[in-house]
Amino acid sequence: MNGAVPMLAIDGPSGAGKGTVAGLLARRLGWNLLDSGALYRLLAFAAVNHGVDLTNEEALKVLAAHLDVQFVAADGSHGQRIILEGEEVTDVIRTEQVGAGASQVAALPAVRDALLQRQRAFLEAPGLVADGRDMGTVVFPDAPLKIFLTASAEERARRRYLQLKAKGADVDQSALLEEIRERDERDSQRAVAPLKPADDAILLDSTEMSIEAVVETIIRHCERQGWDV
């Protein structure tokens, strides 16, 4: 890892607000942004489009290595537009169905290996904010600042419910809660790169915090690193 480039790793479970927080921090700091979860969502989405079974590890490995994807800076909660094979898929890949597929393919060792260098390539000047589930433990283990952002499963389900309702979706909050609990178990129990805080990560529980408060808290930690914020 390029130690001369400032690096902030944000990990945490599904629905903790990592993507929104990372996007806001990247804009605030003027840094590059890596939404690693989007890569796994893109792979699951592309696999379905190309008729690749989500359990076919070898085929998924090949697809992961050749994903034709572009991340374009933009306004909005995620801070970027995502272009896959020439078509914008920014919102399409955010569905619960694609998320479940992403969690499934992310458990495959060959897939994680195929995407590892692709993720590390995002580390460029002036700095990088990376969010995911193994940023501080596997992808960027030497990151000088690591945040593990979490919230109760109930609060994460509530946030997701409000988010989906705002988009006009017909959703059941209790079903969302069950899905979140199942995904937490799957992500934390997988054999490769399980979801867990890095030993040197700062734990931040956002259950009772606003997005703005979370961002400001992390900014204070950035200041302690001596970074220009």
UniProtKB/Swiss-Prot annotation:
Major place of residence: cytoplasm
Reactions accelerated catalytically:
CMP + ATP = CDP + ADP; dCMP + ATP = dCDP + ADP
Q: Which GO terms describe its cellular component?
A: cytosol
- InterPro entries the UniProt entry points to: Cytidylate_kin, Cytidylate_kinase_dom, P-loop_NTPase
A molecular-function term among this protein's GO annotations:
dCMP kinase activity
UniProt entry tagged with the keyword Chaperone: no
Recorded superkingdom: Bacteria
Q: What is its EC number?
A: 2.7.4.25
One Pfam annotation, family name?
Cytidylate_kin
User: Top enzyme class of this protein?
Assistant: transferase
Record-linked HAMAP family: Cytidyl_kinase_type1
The entry's family comment says: Belongs to the cytidylate kinase family. Type 1 subfamily.
Name of the protein this chain belongs to: Cytidylate kinase
Organism of this sequence: Pseudomonas aeruginosa (strain LESB58)
